[in-house]
Design a protein with these regions (language model features):
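Intrinsically disordered, low-complexity regulatory segments enriched in Ser/Thr/Pro
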Residues: 6, 10, 71-129
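Contiguous, amphipathic alpha-helical segments that mediate oligomerization or scaffolding
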Residues: 14-55
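Long, charged, glycine-rich C-terminal linkers/tails
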Residues: 51-70
Length: 148
């Protein structure tokens, strides 16, 4: 085959690959949107409802590619908890203040150890459990009494 024909064939084959990758990218984007709407948002709504029973001021914001819940008590930030996704791997991010009022930021994992998980395998219950673990840890640090 002549070189220019091979070049033309190669060009059109690479276009097919690009379109296939674009479709896959769109699928993943759609799956991430579903993750936020079907797992993160219901978890945060449930948390908001329960935390407000204990006098907490709770704000939630969930979109196609982010989810955040902020908990304040008597004007003080107790925890800003976010669920983010890197590729298809979700992870929690927390922002809070220590007893001195210093802002602290931390990124974590939903499961302990080196277990692999993604948006398809992470459950609403795991999001709730992780939030509770982070929230209780922050409250203990924030409100514990110093000294004997």
């Amino acid at each position: 085959m002549e070189k220019w024909k091979e070049d033309l064939k190669s060009f059109f084959e690479s276009q097919k690959v690009d379109k296939k990758q674009e479709r896959k990218k769109d699928e993943v984007k759609s799956d991430i949107e579903k993750f936020y709407s079907s797992k993160v948002k219901p978890a945060f709504k449930e948390l908001k409802r329960e935390l407000e029973k204990y006098g907490r001021d709770v704000q939630i914001a969930v979109g196609d590619n982010y989810g955040a819940i902020e908990v304040n008590y008597q004007g003080r930030l107790e925890l800003n908890y976010q669920v983010k996704v890197r590729k298809i791997n979700p992870y929690p991010e927390t922002h809070y203040q220590d007893r001195s009022g210093n802002g602290i930021w931390a990124e974590g994992t939903f499961r302990l150890g080196i277990q692999k998980y993604d948006i398809y395998g992470l459950s609403k219950e795991e999001i709730l459990q992780n939030f509770m673990r982070e929230y209780k840890t922050r409250l203990w640090t924030l409100y514990r009494k110093s000294g004997p």
